[in-house]
């Protein structure tokens, strides 16, 4: 299954690049692949694609991407053979409360509250919750984020603590906290 998933992953990433290039003239932001799930066996595999943009993705955009991918699958005999005659294709955005899986997702969540598990230089594991105030993940050799932790003291007063800079390679998981 890994060979199938790897080949589909490469094909879908290339297709996303073509899709983004074609749509960039109309001002639509680039779409990127967050995750790919391949389930089932021939002749009816199920291909689930999680897609995102730096500013979020709409249901309409997911439907457009699904049509684009379906056409790309149909035009490529190798891919048709991998997914089978009766394949299912679903394109959606990552769900609320799911861990961040792609570095560019941090861009979309700048300003939001995150809960992050990470390791320090001595490999000790820590957890911090704070507002995402800085994101440097594109075109850099050392991608990082900066969180501004908040401590709620008695009387519900929020006390701001020193910002925490976290290198992406030290982050074990990051989840966007739902705020009401």
Swiss-Prot record:
Compartment(s) where it occurs, according to its Swiss-Prot or TrEMBL record: Cytoplasm
Top-level taxonomic group: Bacteria
Primary localization: cytoplasm
GO cellular component: cytosol
SUPFAM superfamilies attached to this UniProt entry: YhbC-like, N-terminal domain
InterPro entries xrefs: Ribosome_maturation_RimP, RimP_C, RimP_N, RimP_N_sf
Keywords attached to this entry: Cytoplasm, Ribosome biogenesis
Gene Ontology biological process terms from the UniProt entry: ribosomal small subunit assembly; translation
Similarity section: Belongs to the RimP family.
Chain's role: Required for maturation of 30S ribosomal subunits.
HAMAP family reported for this sequence: RimP
Protein name: Ribosome maturation factor RimP
Protein species of origin: Chlorobium phaeobacteroides (strain BS1)
